[in-house]
Amino acid sequence: MKLLLLALILVLSNINLISGNGLVWPHPRLPCSPYDERGCINTQKCSSTDCDSFKRRIYFDVAYNTAFTIYQHTIFKYYSANYYKVELIVGGKVYFIHKFGQFRGDDCEFDEIIPAFYKKVQFLDLSTPIKATIQFSFDFSSHPKHANIYYSCIDVWLFDSAYYNYCPTNSGGGSGNSGGSWSSGGSGNSGGGWSSGGSGNSGGSWSSGNSGGHSTGDCPTSSGGWTSGSHSSGSWSSGGGSGSSSGGQSSGSWSSGGGSSSGGHSSGSWSSGGGSSAGGGSSSGSHSSGSWSSGGSSSGGQSSGSWSSGGGSSSGGQSSGSWSSGGGSSSGSHSSGSWSSGGSSSGSHSSGSWSSGGSSSSSGNSGWMTASGGNTGGNTGGNTGGNTGGQSSGNSGWMTASGGNTGGNTGGNTGGQSSGNSGWMTASGGNTGGNTGGNTGGQSSGSSSSGGNSGWLTSSGSNSGSSSSGSNSGWLTSSGNSVSSSSGGNSGWLTSSGGNSGGNSGSSSSGGNSGWLTSSGGNSGGSSSSGSNSGASSSGDNTGGNSGWLTSSGGNTGGNSGAATGGNSGGNSGASSSGGNSGGASSSGGNTGGNSGWLTSSGGNTGGNSGAATGGNSGGNSGASSSGGNSGWLTGGVTGGNSGGATGGNSGGATGGNSGGATGGNSGGATGGNSGGASSSGGNSGGATGGNSGGATGGNSGGATGGNSGGATGGNSGGATGGNSGGATGGNSGGASSSGGNTGGNSGGATGGNSGGATGGNSGGATGGNSGGATGGNSGGNSGASSSGGNSGWLTGGATGGNSGGATGGNSGAATGGNSGATGGNSGGNSGAATGGNIGGASSGSSSSGGNSGWLTGGATGGNSGGATGGNSGGATGGNSGGATGGNSGGATGGNSGGATGGNSGAATGANSGAATGANSGAATGANSGAATGANSGNNAAVTGAANGNNGAAAGANSGAATAANSGAATAANSGAATAANRGNNAAATGAANGNNGAAAGANSGAATAANSGAANSGAATAANSGAAAGANSGAATAANSGAATAASGGNGASGAANPGSIVTPNDQNVSPLSNSDAAATAASTTGRNPRNPTSRAPTVTPTPTSSAEEPAAGGEDSSAISKYSIQSFGIFVLSMIIYLVI
């Protein structure tokens, strides 16, 4: 009896101290619910317990309000004195986030909204998700006998969607074999965008799943996330030499260069380069899904979503969504959605296959993955009106080209072909105004070729067939360009071996075609080239095409505008001229051609066809025709247009080119310049040694003192009236006809035609460039049968091609004199030339389409080349790229680009590559990287409308390479995209988010690491410092060396952005993606889906971490109420004990 009574006393005296509180959702370390109370009574702080890495699958967006479900098990009477507190733990530091009262005293579950707290964590670099822990504390310490504080912990990936959006729109899906856009599914429930699924529940965007049930990923708004496989998903691995990435769960791994990626569950692996994965190797496994394989073979039982480029084959029982380009075959019993170019796609269920080839030529529409929308309005409206009268060079895009050709081909292609407009990310509006007004006038009669349109991924069979299309480049391959027609050149991303070999072979020549990695066979072809803008008349032909990497909004704004009746005006008079090369009285639109760029090409042609005024492609393209090259992904920027032509044109021969005297180079008379005879398809082949180079000392050089130099007054100079000048109508004019000039837009033009020997050629005379001689530039040049403008590539080409390769020789000769002549360089060039130079009028014939530049440098390179003022790229005052005063690219005073001995600039040798030696990288010395001085570095004033960090050549591409201190993306302090305070100020990158530095989002300077920036290991470089980026120093670099560098610098340029969209899930001790139920729950719990405008964020504030001693004071009752409660409880206990003792 006494024992029972004693128990009752203890219960009565402690009745108000029983409590239990914790989180039900989202996924705490220890669950707390009516069914599992382990997490309800946890008294250890989160920092004292182990993180459950498996549950770190919540992506917590600080930009949104988020709901948390709390389970409260307490019978406190005075609950209003309690409060709950929310804190964030990052790197061992604790930060206060939110606090709210207990409010309720019953046993229940309820939801509490935690407001967005991005302002409280602005000091964190959330450009990519970081590990963090959210700590909920349930404080009951204000009650008698010091009740405990209970903790619930959630391990999350913290990110800010204002700068980092990891969730795609997952469209489509469903059971069966093929489900979902951007994806092809295998058996099971494959349905997710950007993915190809194996068996099981594979449906994740940007992923390919293996045969498991875990491949729905982390995105709460999609049925599939960014990951696939049960473990190790989405990992990036670049470089590694002979290393290997293999194992049972290697999924989504990137492997570039040398190594091998294989194993039982190798899914979504990227493999490029040597080793056993690409270039003749193989990527295989029992569940090889979504594998990228180039040149080799990808096979296995469930090979789904495999990419295969080259002569290999992709086959298997469930080969779905396979990409196959080239002579290979993609077949299987369930081959769905397969891409096949030039080969065969067959199977019992072959649906939605892409196959281009056969006898008809379609300029094709390439893109990176899809061109959804790109060709919707484009070829829909375009092919109806546009392609009716001719071929359309197609419209490509990297992500989407929606709207890109909507307005464009609709009005544009009505009368003839459109060179199309491509973009990397979006080309919305890119061709809206362009082809609308441009191609209306039925230009492109006769045999024409559009300036070509580059894409990012594939150019599936675009140029195959009997007709000529404006060339369509791709990202991976450009096979299928064989047959007898000429295309404006076709480039690829990985290889373009034979790219234009078969393609441009036969009777016509194309402006050469480069690739990403290699451009072997790039410029081979026949004796003639088709002109894109031929015909009776035309206005605003968008021949050159307007491509861009990220956005091309406004890409043709200045282009076809500035050129208006100018540049391309008088030019192709005579029988006909289309677009910028309109014939007769006037033309609008002008040289759409060189308006490309890597990041943005907004205003890309502003200076280009603008500055060129009536210069540019005017009078130029006399003779049969010349197609402006088409660039690709890796090499060539400037190399394009006037590049390819640069080789022929300014080169002609060592002494020919810009030098040679009156009959030399662009001058030489009618047949001189870019012509150099019946035809010259020098294009951009050979990289640095090709095109304008012909050898570092070749082409424009003809010898250091040869070519453009010949001495200060030699080469293109020859005296004021010499070289390109030759007199008012002399130089490149050589008489009535002029220009050919804008072959690569004003870009190629900058380098080639107008540049040729940049300095010499366009300079020598008067105010230089196309100015020098009134009708200078590519004037007289393109007479003769034809010349193709050459085609640039992705990475180096820029200065390397046209003005570069030749930059060394040609522009060197006379140091600053060369390109300078006057500091105008190409300034006076297309400008001074005014109605002179390229107007020349007389040239008729087919036409020439402006070239189209490539991916990285080409940007500014496109239009007037990197140099905002144009003429010559990069140079602040024009002249030749890079050089402060113009002169020759790279070196401050010119000479041989990159440095006196740069000779082989661009591609050249390692040491002098890119931009000379480390100290003098890019241009000038380290302090004066890019063009400007140290103080102005990154703000390359020459770049029209460019804001902080937008250096010369492209949107924000900081100095060519620069030294460690001033490397492309510079150090944290000098980062191209600036420090955290200046995040997202990359004005030129339209729509680019935080830290989209220069070339790509955070692509570290030229290539390289801080130590080896741009100079020593530039270009293709070694594996460690690879231009395309291998390993630790890959394009997007490591956190420490990333484009925008360290967190202290605002985290500009994270690796993910370098490959937009392919964001991977950070690996944390075998991270597992969310299940379907998790994803649904996450979606249901997120509120306020209207992200703020990143540009309106408050200034960066670094809060001081709070310790427990600094926590906000508890709210609730006053001390008197608590005392009364304590006395009451104590009284119950004493009274009970008296009763017990009496009994």
Swiss-Prot record:
Side Extracellular, residues: 21-1121
Chain positions covered by the region annotation Disordered: 177-1120
Localization (cell): Membrane
Cytoplasmic side: 1143
Record key words, sorted: Membrane, Signal, Transmembrane, Transmembrane helix
Biased composition (Low complexity): 222-236, 284-296, 331-368, 393-403, 445-498, 506-541, 906-1059, 1094-1114
Annotated signal peptide: 1-20
Composition bias type Gly residues, residue spans: 177-203, 237-283, 297-330, 374-392, 404-418, 430-444, 555-573, 580-596, 604-622, 629-783, 790-843, 851-905
GO cellular component assignments: membrane
Transmembrane parts of this sequence: 1122-1142
Major subcellular location class: membrane
Ranges of biased composition (kind: Polar residues): 1062-1078
Keyword Signal: yes
Membrane topology according to the record: Single-pass type I membrane protein
Protein name: Uncharacterized transmembrane protein DDB_G0289901
Naturally occurring in which organism (per UniProt): Dictyostelium discoideum (Social amoeba)
